[in-house]
Amino acid sequence: NFPPDIGGIQSLMEGLSKSLAKHGAVKVFADEYLNFRNYDQSSSLDITRIKGFKIFRKFRKAFLVNEYLENNSVKGIFFDHWKSLEYVKSDYLTKFPNFCLIHSKEINHSLGGSLNSRMNKAFKKTKFIIANSKYTKDLAISMGLEKSKIHIINPGTNYPVKIEKEESLKAKVIFGSAFPRLITVARLDKRKSHQNILMTIKNLIPTYPDIKYVCIGDGDEKNNLESLRVQLGLEEQVVFLSRTD
């Protein structure tokens, strides 16, 4: 999970890597992705890409990480997912502080199932488990993870960036005199319940007739959400934008 792939975890790992780079050298192991060469060439990070079929990449990545840890001393290790941690040797992990991030979708595996067993076995090797919310921490505990290892760090954000005049004008066209103005930026998946936001907007119109909601993102649910917008008569109140917009 690393750019130029798009997503919340990808952005988080990029931000984490860039922040850590201010305090010393950072080595990144990540899967190949479309246009990765352009990204890597423009990045100041030392990135090793893993290619091949997905089923084999985790083994290749673990081999490279194990080899690196055998030959280098590091200050800390960060994993984006328990599957990235799974095949890294315990002997190396005991030598260095190590952290694994967790998000609810990636750990929601039924107790007693094979994925849950693999997950718990992997997490026994890590020193710190970083949950992005109290909800995720509680879910992790219910999935069998050690409570004492779990710490909550809510997702951060980059410092405000300069807004170009073109983007500022585009925002004024979209929002006009609307109030209140609501925005979400997320992948449009069923589990994120964007349909509930649309129904809430519908219920708020009597109180806030000038409300405007801008939903930024793409995903499997986009067509369904666009249809729901029409069914609820929210063509004026709800705008869908993709990343390219």
Model region roles, listed by residue range:
Residues 130, 174-192, 198-201, 214:
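Conserved donor-binding/catalytic core segment of Leloir-type glycosyltransferases
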Residues 162-176:
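A short helix/loop element that forms part of the nucleotide-sugar donor recognition site in Leloir-type
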Residues 221-224, 234-245:
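Active-site donor-binding acidic/aromatic loop of nucleotide-activated sugar
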Residues 56, 85-86, 98-113, 125-128:
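A short, histidine- and acid-enriched strand-loop-helix "catalytic/donor-clamping" loop
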Residues 79-85:
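Short His-centered aromatic/hydrophobic patch
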